[in-house]
């Protein structure tokens, strides 16, 4: 079995698909969008919808690249409830570059909830947090996410995390969104978060930043420009999330508000 978080590496529109799986690819400007829908259990990926967007290397993009941000925001918005508060969770270890995408993305989220911030008509309530790793907090990701959900009471949770690919040419060049929750491909991962555990829609968002080396199961491969992939990828994902949640604001306005 291929070790990958990317649904379209397992199920493509050009191959024979197992029963209960549909895949389709379309072009939107310079972005290739692939949608995979899994309608039954028992396959390599959980049942649900997956969307991947093939883009130029995110290391050369930023939060103002509308050609990528607009289609990404549209695809993400389609997976979310139409209204209500949203909590964005930055999963990962900010001290390990390949795993820092989630925490770095949270820094780019337009937060509209908080003490002293009255509701604004037309602006969706959004909170964002990077809970850290259990070795630092003493609490599991499931415990922290559960406590945050009970306190904030969002209508949906967006989990941002670094992803694993099985194809080196896709590292730093693909965005993926899914409504299946966070279900890492790596065996023994403690990052599983889904609707069954938390009682609300859980959307996963990420960019592949590593792959497992074939020569050894304990070795990983990362792109040469990893620092730029994380920095620019976090800005790009943050902009797409902001645009998906605040469609009344332009990309330029959101960039100015985030700073």
Annotate each PLM feature.
Residues 71, 75, 97-114, 174-183:
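A glycine- and small-aliphatic-rich helix-loop capping segment at beta-alpha/alpha-beta transitions
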Residues 54-56, 85-96, 128-132:
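Short glycine-rich or small-residue beta-strand-to-loop segments that form or flank ligand, phosphate
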Residues 129-130, 143, 159-259:
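A structural signal for small-residue-enriched, beta-sheet-centric alpha/beta enzyme cores
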Residues 1-48:
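N-terminal amphipathic/basic leader segments beginning at the initiator methionine
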Residues 122-149, 153-157:
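A structural-propensity feature for long, helix-poor, extended segments
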Residues 101-135:
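Anionic-ligand anchoring segments at beta-strand to alpha-helix junctions in alpha/beta enzyme folds, i.e.
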Residues 40-80:
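An N-terminal, well-structured beta->alpha segment
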Residues 91-101, 135, 162-166:
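Gly/Ser/Thr-rich loops at beta-strand to alpha-helix junctions
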